[in-house]
C-alpha cells in the first residue's frame, strides 16, 4: 500500500506525516538525526496488514519546523508526540520507536498510559543508563556537516555498505544541513551527554506495562546502541520478548524488514486483542 505524506500543524510549528492504511493505529517514531521517511516502507508494509500506520518528523528533523527554542529533551519531545496524536485524532494506539524515538514513545506512554496500549522499542536509548562514551559518540554524529561525514555516519548505523548509496548520502546531507538543523541537533546532543540520566524510564515502564505489552527489537550488529543494552533493558523491564535481528545494525526495520515484521506483527495482534 502506497503511503501519503502531508504537513500537520502541531503547537507553534508543523511536522510531516507519512501515513497509510486504516484500522488500529500504529505510530512510528524515528531517532535523533533521522526523519519519518526512514519508516516509509515499514508504514506501507504494516498498513497492508490491516493497520493505520503513521510516522512523523520530530521537531527540527526532516521537513518539520526549525525553531530556536524547539523541544530538545525527551519530556518535551514526548509531549510533542502526544500532541501529534491529538492533531491526528488518534485516541489510542501502539507506538514503535527507534533509538531516541524509543525513549520518546516510552516517556509519552508513562505520561499518558491510556493513550498507548503497547510499545515496540528498537535499539532503544534512555530506557536504562547508557555509557557516557555512547552518548558522546551519538552527540558527535549528529553534528556532522559534510557529505563525507554523512557517509561515515550512515556506514556506522547500517550493516551493509551497499545500502549507503550516493543518493542516500545526498538526501541526508541536504536535509540535515538545512538552516537551523545542526543547531537543533546539537541541543538534543547536549541533553544526551549531560541530562538524559534525569529521564531514564525503565522503572516507570515496568510498573505501567506488563512484559507482554513491551517488545524489544535489536540489530545483532548494532554499533550505536550495542546489544548488551538490549539485555539490560530486558532485565529492567521484567523480561519482555527480545527479537535480535540478524544482518542488521541500528536500523533493523530497514535492513532486514522480513525479520523485523515477523517480530512486530504477532506483537501487534496481541496488543490490539479485544480492542473495539
Label every PLM stretch briefly.
Residues 1-26, 48-51, 90-91, 268-276:
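Alpha/beta-hydrolase fold catalytic core
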Residues 16-63:
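Conserved HGGG/HGGXW glycine-rich cap/lid loop of the alpha/beta-hydrolase fold
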Residues 48, 55-100, 254, 262:
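Active-site loop/oxyanion-hole signature of alpha/beta-hydrolase fold enzymes
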Residues 106-110, 117-148:
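Flexible "cap/lid" loop of the alpha/beta hydrolase fold
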Residues 130, 147-208:
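Conserved alpha/beta-hydrolase catalytic His-Asp/Glu region
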Residues 210, 216-218:
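Short beta-strand/loop motif that positions the catalytic acidic residue
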Residues 221-225:
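Acidic catalytic loop of the alpha/beta-hydrolase fold
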Residues 239-276:
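Catalytic active-site module of serine/aspartate enzymes centered on a nucleophile-bearing elbow/loop
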